[in-house]
Amino acid sequence: MNRSPGEFQRYAKAFQKQLSKVQQTGGRGQVPSPRGAFAGLGGLLLLGGGALFINNALFNVDGGHRAIVYSRIHGVSSRIFNEGTHFIFPWLDTPIIYDVRAKPRNVASLTGTKDLQMVNITCRVLSRPDVVQLPTIYRTLGQDYDERVLPSIVNEVLKAVVAQFNASQLITQREKVSRLIRENLVRRASKFNILLDDVSITYMTFSPEFTNAVEAKQIAQQDAQRAAFVVDKARQEKQGMVVRAQGEAKSAELIGEAIKKSRDYVELKRLDTARDIAKILASSPNRVILDNEALLLNTVVDARIDGRGK
């Protein structure tokens, strides 16, 4: 039981004061009477007994704590003691102090999914006792109530909820899994007068075989997407070639019709080609001598064509 330093100092000062009075009475050179000696000794005993009684009759409840009292006569009292200093009957009553602040606890469990995959899952719970039910908690569970209850109910709820989902659903539907675990845990803990402020899944791992299978599936999906992209690209290139071929065919058809209607188009193309050949030869460092036939500039043919045209 906690005592304030001021109380002990007051008791010590009173004891020293009474002791100094006895010493002063004996130091005057007079022989004290037996009655006076017994009176002084009785006063010391009374003062010491009073200090001991007060020391055992008071106890403190710190912040964030609550207390109940066990009586040797009546058993566990239903009264809840709040923070502060309180009085009890020494040697008959015993204070039992509970920490009512929320405390975190991590519980790990190895369980199986609906598709028979093993998963390691860790659940973090933030729990505290129901203050109103502290006498019942002490009667049924004691002061280590969280050690007795939380590991078993958390494991049971985790196994029951995880068994409802496939391994892949634990990842894609994690919010739903967490909600079901929270609802079931809050309901189970309330039967033991334990309040849960927060429940969350902090860790989840699968077997190496399942992890490798998931990675292989992801790689296969990426390869399939890459192949689909290549096929789509080839299809687009093929369509482009068809369009170009159709354009070239249409162009050839138009050129043929133009030639049929007039030979001036052929002469224009011949002159353009001759000009291109001349530019290439002029820019070449080698000396080349060509006649009109090679340059497509046959003047005789040109004159003959001109004569026919006339």
UniProtKB/Swiss-Prot annotation:
Post-translational modification: The N-terminus is blocked.
Membrane-related topology note: Single-pass type II membrane protein
Record keywords: Coiled coil, Membrane, Mitochondrion, Mitochondrion inner membrane, Signal-anchor, Transmembrane, Transmembrane helix
Coiled coil spans: 212-253
Biological process, per Gene Ontology: mitochondrion inheritance; mitochondrion organization; mitophagy; negative regulation of proteolysis; protein folding; protein stabilization; substrate localization to autophagosome
One cellular component term from this protein's GO annotations in UniProt: mitochondrial prohibitin complex
Main subcellular location of this protein, as a coarse class: mitochondrion
CDD domains hit by this protein: SPFH_prohibitin
Keyword Mitochondrion attributed: yes
Pfam families: Band_7
Organism superkingdom: Eukaryota
Entry keyword DNA-binding: no
Effect of inactivating the gene: Impairs mitophagy.
Protein's cellular compartments: Mitochondrion inner membrane
Chain intervals for the UniProt region annotation (Interaction with ATG8): 130-144
Ranges annotated as spanning the membrane: 38-58
Motif range (AIM): 138-141
Similarity field: Belongs to the prohibitin family.
Oligomeric form and interacting partners: The mitochondrial prohibitin complex consists of two subunits (PHB1 and PHB2). The subunits assemble into a membrane-associated ring-shaped supercomplex of approximately 1 mDa. The mitochondrial prohibitin complex interacts with the m-AAA protease, a heterohexamer composed of YTA12/RCA1 and YTA10/AFG3. The mitochondrial prohibitin complex interacts with ATG8 and the interaction may support mitophagosome assembly.
Function statement: Prohibitin probably acts as a holdase/unfoldase for the stabilization of newly synthesized mitochondrial proteins. Involved in mitophagy; may act as an adapter for ATG8 that supports mitophagosome assembly. Negatively regulates the proteolytic processing of ATG32 via the i-AAA protease. Acts as a negative regulator of the m-AAA protease.
Alphabetized PANTHER family for the sequence: PROHIBITIN, PROHIBITIN-2
Miscellaneous comment: Present with 2850 molecules/cell in log phase SD medium. Mitochondrial targeting of PHB2 is ensured by a bipartite non-cleavable presequence at the N-terminus.
The protein's name: Prohibitin-2
Species: Saccharomyces cerevisiae (strain ATCC 204508 / S288c) (Baker's yeast)
Gene expressing this chain: PHB2
